Amino acid sequence: MAKIKLSAISTRAPKKADKEKLKAETEKILVELDELQNRLIAESKHSLLVIIQGMDASGKDGILRDVFGSLNPLGVSVTSFKAPTAEELSHDFLWRVHEAAPAKGMIKIFNRSHYENVLVTRVHPEYILNEHIPGINSVKDIKPSFW
């Protein structure tokens, strides 16, 4: 399997993109994804976690529909992380992430992720108090080394 260096892939669309060519390439990739998913399910040795992170209206739902919509729905599920529920807040910071992790043979897509919480808490450190982190009982307990 080829190694992919994500930092070498531009996040911007090409200026002169040939939409028909891109659609044809996408179709080819979707066929390959279908084959890989079948192997993943059959072997049941590994799982795949895909994290889609982006601002509101950045196209996350379009990616889910256009890329993952062609896969076998029995082998794919999506979890959207919104504001934590009372049950989630009663556990540690990563509990809901671990609860949503994919089983072997499955593909799980996180529509947003716990990484977003890291960014939000830098702006609103008081939110950390809801995460039940040992030794942090007030905002004053959050030392610079925490970040």
Which residues make up each language-model segment?
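Glycine-rich phosphate-binding loop of ATP-dependent small-molecule kinases
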Residues: 1-147
